[in-house]
Amino acid sequence: MATLEQLRFDNTYARLPAGFGARVHPSPFPDAKLVSVNPAALKLLDLTPEEAQRPEFVAAMGGAKPLPGMEPFAMVYAGHQFGVYVPRLGDGRALLLGEVRDAAGAKWDLHLKGGGPTPFSRGGDGRAVLRSTIREYLCGEAMHGLGIPTTRGLGILGSQAPVYREAVETGAMLVRMAPSHVRFGTFEFFHYTEQTEHVATLADHVITEHFPQLAGQEGRYARFYTEVVERTARLIAQWQAVGFAHGVMNTDNMSILGLTLDYGPFGFLDDFEPGFICNHSDDRGRYAFDQQPRIGLWNLACLGEALLTLISEDEARAALATYQPAYNAHFMDRMRAKLGLRETRDEDRELVSDLFARMAEAHVDYTRFFRALGHFASADGADTRPVRDMFPAPEGFDAWAGRYRARLAAEGSVDAERHARMTRVNPKYVLRNWVAQEAISRAEAGDFSLVDRLLGVLSDPFAEHPDAEPYAAAPPTWGRHLAVSCSS
């Protein structure tokens, strides 16, 4: 294991030509202190939890005393926000502290969120609030536990300093990790400002660092774009399969590596509601749960437009044409796994569609249903009450269950083996908004024990965790269908 002082920085992004961002001196909270740390993320940097308890950890990660090799840097980008192009955004309250090479040679961005104003703050204070910091910290680990590509939180630095939003809130900073923070909107910025040489420089940088098999190859830009299309299709299929709504799928929130990026007004489904809107600012439902696959394609088309100085229109169209088949294949693979099916059959799509229609009509809890379905007894006449009782009118479930039973029999499914498979892919725990709010309320009162407890539970969401059972329950009345603000 390493010490802080042994971290190896290789700041490739900060070494790009002028115009990719701005070097910034962080303005951390003077009373910043470590209030939660993620041991699993520390391990990626070869650091121990004990190393994080050193005062130097807070000073370095909070930006007060950067480590040798750190070069705090705010990245510039643009983006389509709710379908409207905004020509200049950038890291308004975030900083790339530096890029660390781990012992295996993998590279990790260390990103500080809430470290004060930057040239891209657009009049804002550059701060983050504890509420949104906890939500992002926990959801990053929840998504990682679910096997979904994501940024991850290294730790939360708390403060007593007030931050002024719609109300006065408690300030905090998040130390975030990811292989890269390059976005679709990064390419858009250089394209629409007609800096075509920077579009090529950025593409070559991303290819060299993250798609090295394409470096120097003929046709590399078209192949790169096709790979981004594939990764994005896979990511959104994974979101849909676990019932995750991002809430603000602007192109500046889309990762070029297919990571879940920028957790804001997200939400996991409680009842299965295809049109679920988790962002209360999304009055037209542009980013509703069932619109995410369509928006993924729209965003990729925006990226393709930004790459047209590197690829032809025919190459862009060919890459985009792979999106829907890739999405469909990934989504159905996930749904077959959730249903415990081993074989691929033509009728599977209809089986899933029929189930979804019945779940939506009956307002069945999405996560709890699939977890319980693992215990479905497939023998004719077997007791199916644990799942059946989730439907107010059980006859609707019975009709689907007959088809499901026949489908299981057709591939010779064995209940015990199927149960084991389904338990590995259907989580017991997701970060429901009401659970996050409970952790936030306690933390705002100075108690971070639930934040730490949930971090552990969500990192292993398929296990039973008997002492966390209340957080697998259906939400209380006050916690149903919560919509969340973009304010952070």
Curated annotation (Swiss-Prot):
Cystines in this chain: none
Catalytic activity: L-seryl-[protein] + ATP = 3-O-(5'-adenylyl)-L-seryl-[protein] + diphosphate; L-threonyl-[protein] + ATP = 3-O-(5'-adenylyl)-L-threonyl-[protein] + diphosphate; L-tyrosyl-[protein] + ATP = O-(5'-adenylyl)-L-tyrosyl-[protein] + diphosphate; L-histidyl-[protein] + UTP = N(tele)-(5'-uridylyl)-L-histidyl-[protein] + diphosphate
Presence of keyword Isomerase: no
GO MF assignments: AMPylase activity; ATP binding; magnesium ion binding
Family, as annotated: Belongs to the SELO family.
PANTHER family: PROTEIN ADENYLYLTRANSFERASE SELO, MITOCHONDRIAL (PTHR32057:SF14)
Protein name per its UniProtKB record: Protein nucleotidyltransferase YdiU
Naturally occurring in which organism (per UniProt): Myxococcus xanthus (strain DK1622)
Lineage start: Bacteria, Pseudomonadati, Myxococcota, Myxococcia, Myxococcales
